């Protein structure tokens, strides 16, 4: 085994290692950022809807499912009885 092969083999692995690290960092950032995004969305949705209807903040649930090709945002808001009358009188 020549000395040149030792150096040429390592030079080729550096880009591969860099790419793997970038993929790992991107994956960790996406997982780390998800709860922050969900909390921000939840707070903004809560603020908009609560302008029109009194809400219990504990009754607002926001979920995000990330698929291979599509991400789905699900918002579940439990409205109190009589909320439909509040919408009609506000409009």
Curated annotation (Swiss-Prot):
InterPro entries: MinE, MinE_sf. It comes from the Bacteria. HAMAP family: MinE. GO terms for biological process: cell division; regulation of division septum assembly. Disulfide bonds: none annotated. The keyword Aminoacyl-tRNA synthetase does not apply. Keywords: Cell cycle, Cell division. This is Cell division topological specificity factor. Signal peptide: none annotated. The keyword Transmembrane helix does not apply. Belongs to the MinE family. Prevents the cell division inhibition by proteins MinC and MinD at internal division sites while permitting inhibition at polar sites. This ensures cell division at the proper site by restricting the formation of a division septum at the midpoint of the long axis of the cell.
């Amino acid at each position: 085994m020549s000395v040149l092969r030792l150096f040429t083999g390592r030079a080729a692995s550096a880009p591969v290692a860099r790419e793997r690290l970038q993929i790992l960092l991107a994956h960790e950032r996406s997982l780390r950022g998800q709860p922050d995004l969900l909390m921000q969305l939840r707070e903004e949705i809560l603020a908009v809807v609560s302008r029109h209807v009194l809400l219990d903040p504990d009754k607002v649930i926001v979920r995000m499912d990330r698929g291979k090709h599509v991400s789905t945002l699900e918002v579940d808001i439990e409205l109190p009885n009589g909320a439909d009358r509040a919408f009609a009188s506000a409009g």
